[in-house]
Amino acid sequence: GFEVIAQAKLGGQTYTVALGREMVALAGAHTVGFARMGNLPPSAGAQLEIR
């Protein structure tokens, strides 16, 4: 299989996260809204809870 990688900006910092997981764990981060971009599937536009 493969993982879809996307970048999320939060507090001026850019995080690189792998989509397709129920949650992406980033320390001290809040909910991030991913903008749809390039070849990412519609699910990439969904918000992921970061906790």
Swiss-Prot record:
Function: Removal of H(2)O(2), oxidation of toxic reductants, biosynthesis and degradation of lignin, suberization, auxin catabolism, response to environmental stresses such as wounding, pathogen attack and oxidative stress. These functions might be dependent on each isozyme/isoform in each plant tissue.
Biological process (GO), any one: response to oxidative stress
Major place of residence: secreted
Name of the protein described by the UniProt record: Suberization-associated anionic peroxidase 1
Organism: Capsicum annuum (Capsicum pepper)
Cofactor dependence: heme b; Ca(2+)
Cofactor annotation remark: Binds 1 heme b (iron(II)-protoporphyrin IX) group per subunit. Binds 2 calcium ions per subunit.
Intracellular or extracellular location(s): Secreted
Transmembrane segments: none
InterPro entries named among the record's database cross-references: Haem_peroxidase_sf
Annotated binding of heme, by residue: H30
GO CC, alphabetical: extracellular region
Binding site for Ca(2+): T31
Keywords annotated in UniProt: Calcium, Heme, Hydrogen peroxide, Iron, Metal-binding, Oxidoreductase, Peroxidase, Secreted
EC number: 1.11.1.7
UniProt catalytic activity: 2 a phenolic donor + H2O2 = 2 a phenolic radical donor + 2 H2O
Molecular function as annotated in GO: heme binding; lactoperoxidase activity; metal ion binding
Family of the protein in this entry: Belongs to the peroxidase family. Classical plant (class III) peroxidase subfamily.
